[in-house]
Amino acid sequence: MIWKRKITLEALNAMGEGNMVGFLDIRFEHIGDDTLEATMPVDSRTKQPFGLLHGGASVVLAESIGSVAGYLCTEGEQKVVGLEINANHVRSAREGRVRGVCKPLHLGSRHQVWQIEIFDEKGRLCCSSRLTTAIL
């Protein structure tokens, strides 16, 4: 297990209240040994004008999961901030909930690199994202 902080799904979801995570109804669903998963609806809050999941919403989901995963790998008063994120949008989604799955690529003492893949309800890859964070 890579997590240094002990936390429940309920506590993770409570952290999103009153901010963008809560507004977009991003829900943390699973904490694995080295994965963190969350879902987000494809609805009026997250669609672009042509009825498809907005690429920016996918990036919000990816950075939200990756940043929380990064925080869970720190100790004490350490904080995590995003340095760089990229995303390749490979399939659109029109409805339902998308699922983001976050895994570490590198866990260093000063930087982390996370791979976040976002899937539609049929398990098809919609977006592949990589987030680099700094530990402060």
From Swiss-Prot:
GO terms for biological process: menaquinone biosynthetic process. It holds the Pfam family 4HBT. InterPro entries: HotDog_dom_sf, MenI, PAAI_dom, Thioestr_dom. Disruption phenotype: Deletion results in a significant decrease in menaquinone production. One of its GO terms (cellular component) is cytosol. Substrate binds at residues 82, 89-92, 106-111. It catalyses: 1,4-dihydroxy-2-naphthoyl-CoA + H2O = 1,4-dihydroxy-2-naphthoate + CoA + H(+). Changing residue 63 to D: Almost loss of activity with benzoyl-CoA as substrate. Keywords: Hydrolase, Menaquinone biosynthesis. The active site is at 63 (nucleophile or proton acceptor). Pathway: Quinol/quinone metabolism; 1,4-dihydroxy-2-naphthoate biosynthesis; 1,4-dihydroxy-2-naphthoate from chorismate: step 7/7; Quinol/quinone metabolism; menaquinone biosynthesis. Changing residue 71 to A: Does not affect activity. Its EC number is 3.1.2.28. Transmembrane segments: none annotated. GO terms for molecular function: 1,4-dihydroxy-2-naphthoyl-CoA thioesterase activity; acyl-CoA hydrolase activity; hydrolase activity. Belongs to the thioesterase PaaI family. Catalyzes the hydrolysis of 1,4-dihydroxy-2-naphthoyl-CoA (DHNA-CoA) to 1,4-dihydroxy-2-naphthoate (DHNA). Also shows significant activity toward a wide range of acyl-CoA thioesters, and minimal activity toward benzoyl-holoEntB. Homotetramer. Dimer of dimers. This is 1,4-dihydroxy-2-naphthoyl-CoA hydrolase. It comes from Escherichia coli (strain K12). The gene is menI.
